[in-house]
Amino acid sequence: MKRILVGLGTSGHAESVVSHAIEIAQTQGAELLGVAVVDPSRLEWTGPRPIGVGVETLTAELRQDRMTKVAAEIEKANKLFAEKCLAANVPHQTCERTGDPFEIVADLVRYQDLCVFGLHGLFEHDVVPEPTDSLERLVAAGVRPM
């Protein structure tokens, strides 16, 4: 095993995911690829809205707030990943992608031997609810082994 894909979701959950991936990488002599994915279509969807003056402004502010929070979460998770990998002397790279998370991970996994993801906060960075079928969708897309 030489390459491990690590899902960097919410920074709060990233610590255990990164620690687990580092343990595996150390025993196998593997390189880690930390990936953070932003899905703008999910972050921009605000659901049904009332009609009225100022609704568009509030919606735009909500969208901007979500994007700002996601950027901060990704920065924290990437920093944590890099610091822990450096401290453990594990070779690593980071990757940030924008688009459908399931398509992106399915594409990246072709070049990896193992995937390590957390149970929570995989792609939505605690800003919008995580799809309840995330694991099923990853497996259906051919993301293995996890």
Which residue ranges define each predicted feature?
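A short acidic, glycine-rich active-site loop
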Residues: E56-E73
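A generic structural signal for alpha->beta connector loops
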Residues: G29, N89-P91, V143
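Structural beta-alpha unit
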Residues: D39-S41, T68, A72-C115
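Gly/Ser-rich helix-loop-strand patches that form or flank binding pockets
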Residues: V18-H20, F102-M146
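Generic structural signal for residues in well-ordered beta-strands
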Residues: L32, H92-T94, M146
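Small/aliphatic-rich secondary-structure junction motif
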Residues: M1-E61, A141
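Short amphipathic alpha-helical segments at helix-loop
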Residues: V6, L62-R66, R97
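Residue-level marker of alpha-helix boundaries and capping positions
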Residues: L8-G12, A72, E96, H125-D126
